Amino acid sequence: MKLVLMGLPGAGKGTQAEQIVEKYNIPHISTGDMFRAAMKNNTELGKKAKSFMDNGDLVPDEVTNGIVRERLAEDDAKNGFLLDGFPRTVEQAEELENILNDLGTELDAVINIEVDKDVLMKRLTGRWICRTCGKTYHEIYNPPKVPGKCDLDGGELYQRDDDKKETVEKRLNVNMKQTKPLLDFYSEKGKLHNINGEQDIKDVFVDVEKILASF
């Protein structure tokens, strides 16, 4: 079973990825993990990726694609995998097709976890952290007993810059713009399966299982 998992930040992709790889016994292959492994193993592509990352530059497609090619050729990916964080562009999606074609296989499905932007905003901007002990709260899902104060030590709660509304909205807008052409690409190929990510976590996974039952 060869899968790509998609979803905007806050959609619950990580939770579903854990459940998919556990149930179907396939490796969870994320871009970050691939880069780290290639650099740790000191491969030629790993060295190239490191040089770009050390300079704060984006790793170019030719290096990323090469690392993906090496990873998907490994034994544990022969019977299936869950790709997470790749592809990010139509060009990368086309290269993924070439890689899988060279390996004598193809993608089975692309699962996209859909969540309305307003819901994502609530999920992502609700996090508050205690300045004293670092305990994390969420104003909707795990609120403190007294607003603005930590349950454990009464410390002041603050919000990280990454969790502030303006930052989150900008991040979501960038992601939505990047993702749309990719969703259209896979939709045209009949590979795309959209799932309602606003349901309970268990119900989201039930929908995932229904899709994967046909493979």
UniProtKB/Swiss-Prot annotation:
AMP binds at T31, R36, D57, L58, V59, G85, F86, P87, R88, Q92, R160, R171. It comes from Listeria monocytogenes serotype 4b (strain CLIP80459). This is Adenylate kinase. Residues 126-163 are annotated as: LID. Belongs to the adenylate kinase family. One of its GO terms (molecular function) is ATP binding. The lineage of its organism: Bacteria, Bacillati, Bacillota, Bacilli, Bacillales. HAMAP family: Adenylate_kinase_Adk. Pathway: Purine metabolism; AMP biosynthesis via salvage pathway; AMP from ADP: step 1/1. It catalyses: AMP + ATP = 2 ADP. It is found in: Cytoplasm. NCBIfam families: adk, PRK00279.1-2, PRK00279.1-3, PRK14527.1. Zn(2+) binds at C130, C133, C150, D153. Catalyzes the reversible transfer of the terminal phosphate group between ATP and AMP. Plays an important role in cellular energy homeostasis and in adenine nucleotide metabolism. Residues 30-59 are annotated as: NMP. One of its GO terms (biological process) is AMP salvage. PROSITE patterns: ADENYLATE_KINASE. Disulfide bonds: none annotated. GO terms for cellular component: cytoplasm. InterPro entries: Adenyl_kin_sub, Adenylat/UMP-CMP_kin, Adenylat_kinase_CS, Adenylate_kinase_lid-dom, P-loop_NTPase. Keywords: ATP-binding, Cytoplasm, Kinase, Metal-binding, Nucleotide biosynthesis, Nucleotide-binding, Transferase, Zinc. Monomer. Its EC number is 2.7.4.3. ATP binds at G10, A11, G12, K13, G14, T15, R127, T136, Y137, Q199.
